[in-house]
A protein has these predicted regions:
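Leloir-type glycosyltransferase catalytic cores
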Residues: 17, 134, 394-445
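Secretory-pathway glycan-assembly enzymes, especially type II membrane glycosyltransferases
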Residues: 22-28, 43-282, 295-298, 307
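A donor-sugar binding/catalytic signature common to diverse glycosyltransferases
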Residues: 87, 354-400
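N-terminal signal-anchor transmembrane helix specifying type II single-pass membrane topology
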Residues: 2-54
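Well-ordered, non-membrane alpha-helical segments in soluble/globular domains
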Residues: 275-292, 318-323
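Catalytic donor nucleotide-activated moiety binding site of glycosyltransferases and closely related
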Residues: 293, 299-347
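Eukaryotic short linear interaction motifs
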Residues: 109-111, 263-267, 312-315, 376-377, ...
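Donor nucleotide-activated moiety binding/catalytic core segment of transferases
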Residues: 8-12, 328-363
């Protein structure tokens, strides 16, 4: 009797149609998986696999290696672009499974204060240890003294120009992350353009995680507290004048308005409107005043803090002042009228002044800004995060919402009111926040 695995039976089995089909099907599956793994749509997934390869590194903390580093150029421009650039550098380091070496920020806008364009360490603006504690396992920050061998550096030059597409940029990052001979270098140093101008490969939620870890140093927080206290005190003084006429229960609301009407902004936004073929970027002083005054449910009296450019504080003519023209019950103040322009803001560089103003606007009961302003957009993003933590996923309905925000440059649900504004946390990139959008809504998803 022949064995079931005899040569004759085995040859007959190989010749069977079923076997051939199974073999062909297996080959097809193999090549499909191979092609799928190299498609651009799975580049970020590949990045995750690359990171996973390094997870067993003994110098790794929760998956992010602490013995391999990424170095980036000095970060420049305004506070808000610098925050975005820093977050983008962190996420780039995360993709390469490296710790970001603490970059230098810039103390001022280079085109406004050329003599003050000096580097300022990240930890003079944001808390270093707190950042690493809050972002542990997601991204990491290290000091240059953590580098053992400064001579062991590999330079990565960022591409530029129209031909340097998002896909090419992502392929470059994947290549450097997966190339073992390059990965052996202790430091990969990125050269070329500012991180704000790098291609964006990350979602709004990824950026939001980094922003949440960026807590300002105590000195900036205390100065913001002082400004807010001055605003509250000004409101109480106005209440005292009105109490003889009417009894007003509870604290007077504090509304922060990021009012962009200075000359250089108006020139920029007009050009932007022409290029984008839209008419909802620029807002006149009259339009801002009308829409803020028509906010639904706004109690009076209400204190307004006007976050404006310093050039607007020097207006001599009364009709051009940002303080005149508001409807009854709205009590406007700006830095100069509050008495904090020199006492508090004047002590610091442009960057620190912006950080203080950011914190003041963040703490307002209501915030009103321009959806094409990065400053406004980042404040709304942070207020959206705070609202979501309270279970508030939208601000579409009237009611108590501690973190409600509005865009005064966009029409709301009825004539003459601003649009309710929450950041859409489902966006796959930071495009709308970095460069502005007129497609904002009262929903965070």
């Amino acid at each position: 009797m022949n064995s079931p695995l005899s040569g004759k039976n085995w040859r007959l089995f190989l010749k069977s149609v079923a076997c051939k089909c199974l073999v062909l099907f297996g080959i097809a599956l193999f090549y499909r998986a191979l092609l799928f793994s190299y498609s651009p749509r799975n580049a970020l997934s590949n990045g995750s696999l690359i990171r996973a390869r390094h997870m067993s590194d003994s110098s790794s903390t929760s998956g992010i290696r602490t013995d391999k580093f990424l170095e980036v150029p000095q970060i420049v421009w305004g506070l808000n672009n610098q925050k975005i650039a820093f977050a983008r550098a962190c996420l780039t380091a995360r993709m390469m499974n490296r710790t970001l070496l603490m970059p230098s920020l810039s103390a001022s806008l280079f085109y406004k204060e050329l003599d003050k364009l000096r580097p300022i360490p990240f930890d003079k603006v944001f808390q270093f240890e707190r950042f690493n504690s809050l972002c542990s396992g997601f991204v990491g920050l290290a000091r240059f003294e953590n580098v053992r061998n400064r001579a062991q550096v590999f330079d990565l030059e960022k591409g530029s120009g129209r031909r340097w597409t998002v896909e090419r940029d992502l392929e470059q990052l994947k290549h450097f992350a997966s190339n073992e001979s390059i990965d052996e270098f202790e430091v990969i140093r990125v050269t070329g353009k500012n991180p704000f101008l790098w291609h964006d490969h990350w979602s709004v939620e990824d950026y939001a995680k980094v922003f949440e870890c960026m807590v300002v140093v105590d000195e900036i927080s205390r100065e913001a507290d002082r400004v807010v206290m001055k605003i509250r005190e000004a409101g109480e003084a106005e209440r005292a004048k009105l109490e003889s006429k009417t009894k007003i229960p509870g604290p007077i609301p504090f509304v922060a308005v990021h009012m962009r009407i200075e000359i250089d902004w108006m020139i920029h936004c007009k050009k932007l409107e022409q290029r984008k073929k839209v008419s909802e970027i620029c807002s006149s002083k009259r339009e801002i005043m009308e829409r803020v005054g028509n906010i639904s449910g706004l109690k009076t009296p209400t204190v307004l803090y006007l976050a404006v450019a310093d050039t607007l504080l020097e207006e001599k003519e009364e009709n051009s002042s940002v303080l005149t023209g508001w409807r009854d019950g709205l009590i406007p103040f700006e830095k100069k009228k509050l008495g904090v322009k020199e006492e508090i803001y004047g002590k610091y560089s442009y960057l620190i002044q912006s950080a203080i103003d950011y914190e003041v606007c963040l703490r307002a009961d209501i915030f009103v800004g321009n959806s094409f302003s990065t400053f406004s957009s980042l404040i709304v993003l942070e207020r959206t995060q705070k609202a979501r933590k309270l279970g508030l996923m939208s601000s579409c309905e009237d009611g108590e919402n501690k973190w409600i925000s509005y865009a005064y440059n966009l029409p709301g649900e009825s004539i003459g009111v601003p649009r309710r504004w929450m950041t859409n946390m489902t966006h796959s990139s930071l495009q709308a926040i970095s460069y502005g959008s007129n497609s904002v809504s009262c929903s965070s998803w």
